[in-house]
């Protein structure tokens, strides 16, 4: 920026006056904007060579100013491009104040375990799982590729939602059988989060990340089950034409009378549906700490996306991530 100001100051210096010249008086307000004192200097140039010289100086000055601005922007972006924060234990998170956590991304992370064993080492019995946290680390959507005639496959996406997609404070009964199998039932907690991702082609896919009413069973290294996926929009939500599932207009299509508003191609737009659907999740235990009752692992969930109250066909969304829980006997 200093270089651009110096170049601008150079252009403000007077040049020799020749015949057939055009006098350009410097503007006092422009000088003050650059922090320069106004001394009544004049910038003069001939219609031929002097004008070309002035234009060349202007181009050089703009290049210097542009380079200075680009460098400043690069420095600012580089300074703010910090990586994900270090994953903390439950006790470390609890010991931090609000200001220490604010803006760091820690509030969107599940805790980890310091120490422990790389196996499920809880005795058979009935436990109560609490503080269950599920943190997604990747979202993929089953869709066609950017190029034509490509088969359906799970495409990588770009997250459009802020760091508010982690499920937390989930609890429910957790049972360990004598044969080593486990069973978990979700009962309460922050068990849903609205998320929107963007496909490579630009299409945005909203969905409700959830494990509502989950009943998962199996071995600790792989126990799975189905869960309820509520409608992304509630039944009282109204579209731009005032149509809803439980309120609003029944039909809002500007067509002549004769039942055309109930035709099949328009029925899905007029007849809103807030019906729930099903998803499936598989959880795996990777590490436990029996003395504190802590368990961590990984999960993979496949669930449908938003249907716009029945107007669109849902897409399969695969969510992978890590989870944490505490077991109390």
Curated annotation (Swiss-Prot):
The keyword Transit peptide appears for this protein: yes
Main localization (coarse): plastid
Annotated GO CC locations: chloroplast thylakoid membrane; photosystem II oxygen evolving complex
One biological process term in Gene Ontology: photosystem II assembly
Transit peptide limits: 1-81
Keywords attached to this entry: Chloroplast, Manganese, Membrane, Photosynthesis, Photosystem II, Plastid, Thylakoid, Transit peptide
Location within or outside the cell: Plastid, Chloroplast thylakoid membrane
Stretches the record annotates as Disordered: 258-281
InterPro entries recorded: OMP/PagP_b-brl (IPR011250), PsbO (IPR002628)
GO MF entry, a single one: oxygen evolving activity
Pfam family, one: MSP
S-S bridge residues: none
Family label: Belongs to the PsbO family.
Reported function: Stabilizes the manganese cluster which is the primary site of water splitting.
Protein name: Oxygen-evolving enhancer protein 1, chloroplastic
Organism in which the protein naturally occurs: Pisum sativum
Lineage, broadest ranks: Eukaryota, Viridiplantae, Streptophyta, Embryophyta, Tracheophyta
